[in-house]
C-alpha cells in the first residue's frame, strides 16, 4: 500500500517534469495543481505547503476492528486508504493529505478478538493533538476522512474544542442519507452488512470471503454487539449486523462513487466555509 502511494506521488512529480521538459517542480508549486501526501515530503518541502490557505485531509480508519467473519480486521483502514487515493487523484489544489489514523473509538466491538478501541477522551485528544500540531504551521481548515460511526461522537467534540482555537474541523458522516445507497439497499443493518460488504467487493475484493458471509440481523438493543445471546447489547454471533449475502460489486461501485463525490464536495465546502474566530491574544 505504501509503495503504491509513493509511486502515485512520484508519478505526479514525473508527469509534471515531462510536460515541462525540466526537473520536477518544487512541492509548493505542485500543490497549486494537485493534492499531495504529507508523509512523502521532507520537512523543508512541507513547510511552504502548510499555509492558511491549505486544507489538510486526515483519513481515519480502524486498523484492527472486527467486521464479521467475512471481512478483515483492517477493513476500515483499507477503506480510508482507498478514499485517500481517490482524493489524491481528484481533489482540488491546495490539499495536503496527512497519514491515516488507524486507532479510534470503537467500544461496540470489543467482544470479538482482535478488535481495538481507545477511550472517548483519548480519541478526542488524539485528533485535537494531531490537528493542533499541523495548525501550528499555518493551516486552519481540516477535514477528517472518517470511515466509522462510533467515531462521530469524539469528532464532534474535537470540532467544538478546535473551534475555540480558530480552527475549522469537519468530517465525513456515513450516517447521512445517501440516495444511491437508499435506492440499492435491500436489507437493514449498519456493520459488515450489505452496503459495507458491497463497497469492499469493489474496493478490495481479494479481502472479502463471501463464502463465510451470513445474515445476522437480530433485534437492535442498546449497547455494543455481543456474542452472548443473553448479554447486553445486540446479539451477533458473527460480529456483523445486517445481511452481507446480498452484497454485490456493482452495488459497491455505485455507493463508493457516490461517497467519493460527497467527500470532494465536503472538501470544497471546507475551502469556502467561514473560519471560527481566533482566540484573543494573551497580553
Give, region by region, the residue ranges found by the protein language model.
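Extended, histidine- and acidic-residue-enriched regions that form the cofactor-binding/catalytic faces
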Residues: 20-121, 125-142, 147-283
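Positively charged n-region of N-terminal signal peptides that target proteins for export
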Residues: 1-4
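Bacterial N-terminal signal peptides
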Residues: 6-16
Amino acid at each position: 500500500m505504501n509503495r503504491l502511494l509513493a509511486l502515485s506521488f512520484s508519478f505526479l512529480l514525473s508527469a509534471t517534469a515531462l510536460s515541462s521538459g525540466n526537473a520536477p517542480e518544487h512541492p509548493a508549486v505542485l500543490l497549486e495543481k494537485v493534492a499531495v501526501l504529507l508523509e512523502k515530503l521532507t520537512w523543508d518541502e512541507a513547510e511552504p505547503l502548510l499555509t492558511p490557505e491549505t486544507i489538510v485531509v486526515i483519513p481515519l480508519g480502524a486498523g484492527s476492528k472486527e467486521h464479521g467473519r467475512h471481512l478483515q480486521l483492517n477493513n476500515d483502514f483499507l477503506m480510508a486508504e482507498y478514499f485517500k487515493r481517490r482524493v489524491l487523484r481528484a481533489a482540488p489544489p491546495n490539499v495536503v493529505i496527512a497519514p491515516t489514523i488507524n486507532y479510534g473509538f470503537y467500544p461496540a466491538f470489543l467482544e470479538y478478538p482482535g478488535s481495538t478501541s481507545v477511550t472517548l477522551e483519548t480519541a478526542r485528544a488524539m485528533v485535537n493533538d494531531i490537528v493542533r500540531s499541523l495548525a501550528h504551521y499555518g493551516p486552519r481548515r481540516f477535514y477528517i476522512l472518517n470511515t466509522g460511526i462510533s467515531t462521530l461522537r469524539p469528532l464532534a467534540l474535537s470540532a467544538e474544542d478546535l473551534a475555540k482555537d480558530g480552527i475549522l474541523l469537519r468530517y465525513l458522516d456515513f450516517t447521512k442519507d445517501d440516495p444511491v445507497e437508499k435506492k440499492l439497499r435491500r436489507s437493514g443493518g449498519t456493520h459488515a452488512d450489505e452496503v459495507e460488504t458491497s463497497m469492499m467487493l469493489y474496493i478490495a475484493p481479494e479481502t472479502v470471503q463471501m463464502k463465510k458471509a451470513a445474515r445476522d440481523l437480530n433485534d437492535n438493543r442498546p449497547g455494543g454487539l455481543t456474542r452472548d445471546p443473553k448479554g447486553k447489547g445486540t446479539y451477533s454471533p458473527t460480529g456483523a449486523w445486517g445481511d452481507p449475502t446480498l452484497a454485490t460489486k456493482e452495488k459497491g461501485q455505485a455507493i463508493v462513487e457516490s461517497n467519493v463525490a460527497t467527500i470532494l464536495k465536503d472538501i470544497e465546502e471546507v475551502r469556502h466555509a467561514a473560519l471560527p474566530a481566533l482566540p484573543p491574544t494573551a497580553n
